[in-house]
Amino acid sequence: MSLLVWGATLISGFIIVFALMPSLIRYFRARKEGQMIREEGPKWHEKKSGTPTMGGLLFIIAILVTTLWVGGWQHQLQPTTWILMFILVLYGALGFWDDSIKLWRKQNEGLKAWQKLLGQVIGAVILTLVYQHEHLPMALRIPGLGVWSLGIWYMLFAIIWLVGFSNAVNLTDGLDGLVAGQATIAFGAYAVIAYAQNQYNVMLFCLAVVGSLLGFFVYNHKPAKIFMGDMGSLALGGALAAVSILLHHELSLLLIGIIFVIETASVILQVASFKLTGKRIFLMSPIHHHFEMKGWSEWKIDIVFWSIGLVAAVISVATII
């Protein structure tokens, strides 16, 4: 596949988001609809209250449009392409519902935890059923141990993987530009892996995500003019997990998505420590807030986290290809 196709995919996603995002921002500002900031969050985040959210709506549309037209042009609209777009839309719709409730109620509480979990599980179950129908391998590739056939247990693993990483990306989305940058690195890494495996349809999807997120980053870096919302973070997390599954390099996501893993682990450790000992390990979790409390700027945290994520992604890609 030529560099022309790579470039067309990246540029298409970028231009759609870059050109249309100002209109979406103006729409939300005109309606005075913006993100409500959690009271228990860092006090200096209160100035972000009212910033338009649900920017994920536009980059999801850009990803879909780009994947469809480039995939159609290159005859790469295969079943796995539709699976990826389905997960992106379903998890995005769940986040849209959550964000809409927050905007309507003018508070930072949307769907109840069980409602969000139910939606995530339903989406994951549908993915596993389609996966099984396509006779894709129900096996897990474990570095150093080879490929392990899990049979029906692979479906349970896939469900946990999708739900876990969609929530992990959602937890990480607490600083301007952090998730947009890290997700760009992760999807870029999987684009390279997909290319090496001749899975060009998955590669095109990943490149569409990268281009769209770069367009979004123009408006999401500090100081953010718009947030991606749960709509964006849940969709990205679900799609990222689905990509790792369809490329049969599931566990590589632990390294390629190491920042999402660290952020989630910090929350789990914080809660467990407080429940067991009454003491907190971090000044605040997720861990990016801990560094904020230590006096780090958002830009410094972003750059350090992106650097860690980039190094981890390069190592992972190098060991796979």
From Swiss-Prot:
Catalytic activity, EC: 2.7.8.13
Protein's membrane topology: Multi-pass membrane protein
Disulfide bonds: none
GO molecular function: metal ion binding; phospho-N-acetylmuramoyl-pentapeptide-transferase activity
Keyword list, A-Z: Cell cycle, Cell division, Cell membrane, Cell shape, Cell wall biogenesis/degradation, Magnesium, Membrane, Metal-binding, Peptidoglycan synthesis, Transferase, Transmembrane, Transmembrane helix
Protein name: Phospho-N-acetylmuramoyl-pentapeptide-transferase
Catalytic activity: UDP-N-acetyl-alpha-D-muramoyl-L-alanyl-gamma-D-glutamyl-L-lysyl-D-alanyl-D-alanine + di-trans,octa-cis-undecaprenyl phosphate = Mur2Ac(oyl-L-Ala-gamma-D-Glu-L-Lys-D-Ala-D-Ala)-di-trans,octa-cis-undecaprenyl diphosphate + UMP
Recorded metabolic or biological pathway in which this protein acts: Cell wall biogenesis; peptidoglycan biosynthesis
Job description of the protein: Catalyzes the initial step of the lipid cycle reactions in the biosynthesis of the cell wall peptidoglycan: transfers peptidoglycan precursor phospho-MurNAc-pentapeptide from UDP-MurNAc-pentapeptide onto the lipid carrier undecaprenyl phosphate, yielding undecaprenyl-pyrophosphoryl-MurNAc-pentapeptide, known as lipid I.
GO CC, any one term: plasma membrane
Highest classification ranks of the organism: Bacteria, Bacillati, Bacillota, Bacilli, Lactobacillales
Superkingdom classification of source: Bacteria
Cellular localisation: Cell membrane
Enzyme class per UniProt: transferase
GO process annotations (BP): cell division; cell wall organization; peptidoglycan biosynthetic process; regulation of cell shape
InterPro entries, alphabetized: Glycosyl_transferase_4, PNAcMuramoyl-5peptid_Trfase, PNAcMuramoyl-5peptid_Trfase_CS
Similarity section: Belongs to the glycosyltransferase 4 family. MraY subfamily.
CC cofactor: Mg(2+)
Chief place where the protein resides: membrane
Pfam families: Glycos_transf_4 (PF00953), MraY_sig1 (PF10555)
Transmembrane segment boundaries: 1-21, 53-73, 77-97, 110-130, 145-165, 174-194, 200-220, 226-248, 301-321
PROSITE patterns with a match to the protein in the record: MRAY_1, MRAY_2
